[in-house]
Amino acid sequence: MGCCLSKKPSPSLPSSVKPSDPIKPMEPVIEPLEEEAKPKSEKLNQEEEEEEVVVIKHTRSHEERSKKTESDKDSPVSSPVAAEKSNSTPLVRISSCTKEEVDAILIQCGKLSRSNSAAKTRRYSGSKRSFDFDQNERIRGGDAAEEDGMQRNRHRGVERVHGSPRERRRRTPSRERERSGSRERGNVGGGGGGSRRVSRSPAKRSEIRNADSCGSSVNSSNNRPGKFVTIPATDKSNNVEPLVKRITVKRNIGDACRIAASPRSKSPARAGNNVPSLSRSNSRKAEQSPYRRNPLGEIDQNTKKMIESVKPNSRTSRGPSPSRVAVVELTKAPQVVLSRSRSLRKSRDFDLVSNEDNNYTALLLKDIQSFHGKSVDDSVISLPLCVSKACSIVEAVADLNSMTNRTCLRSDSSRFRFTSTVKKADLMEPSFEKYVTVKRGGGSLEESSGSNNVT
């Protein structure tokens, strides 16, 4: 406060030096007026501190005010008529001095008490300040119109510079854009809350950007952090059916599909399925998933196809075929010319009887029984029934192989038949002929009927 009051005599000294000699006796008048103004200004300051009135003023407005007060001081000092008026009405002179001093004191108090003012609520601070200043000016009895204009301008500047931190923070261009976007959204919604501030959480931020860019339902589903569905681009023509495309779905385990018109329900994987049920059980999730398969239906189709493909094979294998009989006849006929073994005699009997019975298994059994009956008489040792069955199986396999290899039927199959029949003869008639070896270097044949023909 002392430094503020020390500044005041500095402009008054050159003003007192400038005028002529008859105005010099005004100097002692100004000094007691200033001394009287000091306790009054201190009293006003104490009253304002008791009322806890906080005032924040701009420095430029104070400089303009100080210039105006200096010009006001110069004008009464220069004219003696004004000096006489000031002597006659000392209250006006006191009020002009105390305005400047009170302004300086209030500015300094405002600088000191800015931290306290920041702690208070700032919603109605402007109106309170203007009301307090107007009251102070009315009490002092100064020019009310000029002071009101000055105070309003000063408060506008103060509010512009020393506004709330939220207002200062929201003055950036990006935040201005966001405010305009939020106002437009509020006007479109028609709720009347266009100036309402939207929260800046990440979820809301993504919602704002998606709503501004494109208002598609796929982007709006991203607001839910529990379920993300990414769908590739599809043809927009309704007439053409889209190709089967893969849909990647990432969702929580317990989150069921609650929307009937979701992209998952429109997927091509569900094209042939029925209308989804309205139940909220967990089975509905399995019904609507595009990866769901119907294993029973697939097994039924596969088994039907397998049964249809297996049935003709079993029939052809069991039933008689004239081509097979003809092949047997063709392959067995030249064997009579090649050798005269007992197995060839058996095949000769088989060829003669084949026209009577067409069942292939019956023919095999009949041939085995007839051969077994003859071999008992000729052979020394009789073989069990399992060996005869094995021989019949070997012959059946030979017949099947001959059917598959029709290209080399007359050359290779005849040799194979011959060797198989020789082996069969060896199995059915175990005699000393098996143990007779033939030397290719020119050895003599020793009572061997079939072993010397083996290549």
Curated annotation (Swiss-Prot):
Record's compositionally biased regions (Low complexity): 1-20, 260-271
Coiled-coil regions listed in the entry: none
Region: Disordered, residue numbers: 1-234, 258-304
Entry protein name: Uncharacterized protein At1g65710
Listed Polar residues bias regions: 213-224
Domain of life: Eukaryota
InterPro entries in the record: At1g65710-like (IPR040412)
Native organism: Arabidopsis thaliana (Mouse-ear cress)
Compositionally biased spans, kind Basic and acidic residues: 35-46, 61-75, 129-143, 156-166, 173-186
